[in-house]
From Swiss-Prot:
Catalysed reactions, as listed in the record: S-sulfanyl-L-cysteinyl-[protein] + uridine(34) in tRNA + AH2 + ATP = 2-thiouridine(34) in tRNA + L-cysteinyl-[protein] + A + AMP + diphosphate + H(+)
Active site: 129 (nucleophile), 226 (cysteine persulfide intermediate)
Sites marked Interaction with tRNA: 154, 373
Protein name (record): tRNA-specific 2-thiouridylase MnmA
Highest classification ranks of the organism: Bacteria, Pseudomonadati, Pseudomonadota, Alphaproteobacteria, Hyphomicrobiales
Organism: Beijerinckia indica subsp. indica (strain ATCC 9039 / DSM 1715 / NCIMB 8712)
Function: Catalyzes the 2-thiolation of uridine at the wobble position (U34) of tRNA, leading to the formation of s(2)U34.
UniProt keyword Cytoplasm present: yes
Binding residues for ATP: 35-42, 61, 153
Gene Ontology molecular function terms on file: ATP binding; tRNA binding; tRNA-uridine 2-sulfurtransferase activity
Location within or outside the cell: Cytoplasm
GO cellular component: cytoplasm
UniProt keyword annotations, A-Z: ATP-binding, Cytoplasm, Disulfide bond, Nucleotide-binding, RNA-binding, Transferase, tRNA processing, tRNA-binding
Disulfide pattern: 129-226
Annotated region (Disordered), positions in chain: 407-431
Length: 431
C-alpha cells in the first residue's frame, strides 16, 4: 500500500488493519528510519511519513572524504548534502544522525570499482553501494535504533505477495525507475524496506517538496558517481591502482596495429570519439568503435559498429528474487525481459541456468552491452513490472560471425570478442 491511500481510515489503518507501510499497527507506534541523502526524494519521504504520524528518524551516511565536494552540484552523500539533510530534519522536527561509513564504503565500493575498471570492465558502484552499504550495514543500524522498517527515496515499489513475502517492482515513472540498481536486493531485505515514491512521478515529488516548504525543493538531481568529483573515472583508478595503468597497442579486429594508447582505463567499450587514431580505418571513412578491452595484454581492440552487436551474456553474482528457484527452471529456459543498461528499456530474452552456469539469450541484437554492467530480469517491459533479479555481465557472445566478416584474419585471437560493448560511454544514473 502506498502513502496517502484512500483506503486508510482516520486511525491510520486500512480495513485489513494495516498502516500505509503494510504493518499491523498505528503509524504513531511505528518507527521508521529514513535514509536521507540530502536530496529532494528522500526529504519528501521523511516529510510524508512524518505528516502521516509515523515516528521518523533520519540517517545520513558520510561515505567518502567530502571536503572537495562541498557545494559541488550533481553528487550525493557529500558535505553539502549532509548539511541539507540535517536542515530538512530540523524543519521536520525529527532526530537526525550522521554515520561515518567512509572506511567500509572504500572497502566495499570504491576499491572493487577501481579493480574492476582496471580490468577493462565498466562497473556499477551504485549496485554494491545499495546492496553492501545501504541495505546491509545501514540495516543493522536501523535495527539498533529499533526501527520497524527502513524507507528510502528510490523510484521502485515493493508489495506484499500471497505467499507472505514481498516482491520488488519497477516504478510507475519509467524515466526515473531505479530498479536496475537494486537487483541485488535480497528477499530478507525486502521484508524491511519501503519505497514510498514508487507510484509517483518526479515532477509530482518536486511539487510536494515545494508545498511542504522543504529547503531542498529546488535542489538539482544527482547524476555523477559520488566519489568521482572531477567526473573522470581514470583519475580514481590512477590514484588507487597506479600499477594498473599500462600503455599498449590499439588494434583493429582484423589484427592490424593502428596506434598506441596510454592505458585501457582511458577507454570505454563502445567509445567512438577520442581514440587518437586520426583517419585510419579498414576502409575510407570507416567509423571505429572500441570493441574490446584486454587489460591483461594492454590492448584496445577497435572495429566497425556491427562488431558491437550481442546476442548472449554470461552472468556472475546472480540474485534471484522471483517466484520459485533457478534450479526449477525448464531446460528450454525462462522467457523474461532484461535490461543491460540503466538508460535503456527492457528487451525480451531467455534466461538459462545449467549447473553453475547462468546466461541470457537476447531475442534481438543488443548493442549496449559491457562486462561489469548489470543484466536485470523483469516479468515484462511495462511500468510496475516485477523485478525477478539479475546478475553482473562477465562475458558476452557476438551476434555476428566474425570469421564471415573477416575471412582471413591475421590474428584470430583478436576476433574472439567475448566482451562486447556500448555505442557510447554508458550514462551514469544516480542510484
Amino acid at each position: 500500500m502506498e502513502l496517502g491511500s484512500s483506503d486508510v481510515t482516520s486511525s491510520g489503518l486500512d480495513h485489513a488493519g494495516l498502516n500505509s507501510l503494510g504493518l499491523p499497527k498505528p503509524p504513531a507506534l511505528t518507527r521508521v528510519v529514513v535514509a536521507m541523502s540530502g536530496g529532494v526524494d528522500s526529504s519528501v519521504v521523511a516529510a510524508l511519513l512524518k505528516r502521516e504520524g509515523y515516528e521518523v528518524i533520519g540517517v545520513t551516511l558520510q561515505l567518502y572524504d567530502h571536503g572537495e565536494a562541498v557545494h559541488r552540484k550533481g553528487a550525493c552523500c557529500a558535505g553539502q548534502d549532509i548539511q541539507d539533510a540535517r536542515q530538512v530534519a530540523d524543519q521536520l522536527g525529527i532526530p537526525h544522525y550522521v554515520l561515518d561509513y567512509e572506511e567500509r564504503f572504500r572497502r566495499k565500493v570504491i576499491d572493487p570499482f577501481a579493480q574492476s575498471y582496471a580490468t577493462g570492465e565498466t562497473p556499477i558502484p551504485c549496485v554494491s553501494c545499495n546492496s553492501e552499504i545501504k541495505f546491509a550495514d545501514l540495516f543493522e543500524t536501523a535495527q539498533h535504533l529499533g526501527a520497524d522498517v527502513l524507507a528510502t527515496g528510490h523510484y521502485v515499489s515493493s508489495k506484499a505477495e500471497a505467499d507472505g513475502g514481498r516482491a520488488l517492482y519497477r516504478s510507475l515513472d519509467s524515466s526515473r525507475d531505479q530498479s536496475y540498481f537494486l537487483f541485488a536486493t535480497t528477499n530478507a531485505q525486502l521484508e524491511l524496506l519501503r519505497f514510498p515514491l514508487g507510484d509517483l512521478a518526479k515532477p509530482d515529488v518536486r511539487q510536494m517538496a515545494r508545498q511542504l516548504g522543504l529547503v531542498v525543493a529546488d535542489k538539482a538531481d544527482s547524476q555523477d558517481i559520488c566519489f568521482v568529483p572531477s567526473g573522470k573515472y581514470s583519475d580514481v583508478i590512477e590514484r588507487l591502482s597506479p600499477g594498473a595503468v599500462v600503455p599498449g597497442e590499439i588494434l583493429h579486429v582484423d589484427g592490424r596495429v593502428l596506434g598506441r594508447h596510454s592505458g585501457v582505463i582511458h577507454y570505454t567499450i563502445g567509445q567512438r570519439r577520442g581514440l587518437g587514431l586520426g583517419a585510419v580505418g579498414a576502409g575510407a571513412g570507416e567509423p571505429l568503435y572500441v570493441i574490446r578491452l584486454d587489460a591483461a595484454k594492454a590492448q584496445v581492440i577497435v572495429g566497425p559498429r556491427q562488431a558491437l552487436a550481442t546476442r548472449r551474456v554470461h552472468l556472475r553474482g546472480v540474485n534471484w528474487i522471483g517466484p520459485g528457484s533457478l534450479q526449477d527452471m525448464d531446460e528450454h529456459g525462462l522467457e523474461i525481459f532484461v535490461q543491460v543498461r540503466s538508460t535503456r528499456a527492457p528487451i525480451p530474452g531467455f534466461l538459462h541456468a545449467h549447473e553453475s552456469e547462468i546466461w541470457v539469450d537476447f531475442a534481438l541484437d543488443e548493442d549496449g552491452v559491457s562486462p561489469g554492467q548489470a543484466c536485470v530480469f523483469y516479468e515484462n517491459d511495462q511500468p510496475r513490472a516485477r523485478v525477478l533479479g539479475g546478475g553482473f555481465i562477465s562475458a558476452t557472445e557476438s551476434a555476428l560471425q566474425m570469421r564471415e566478416m573477416f575471412p582471413k584474419p591475421p590474428n584470430e585471437d583478436l576476433l574472439d570478442t567475448n566482451e562486447s560493448s556500448d555505442l557510447v560511454s554508458p550514462k551514469r544514473s544516480a542510484c
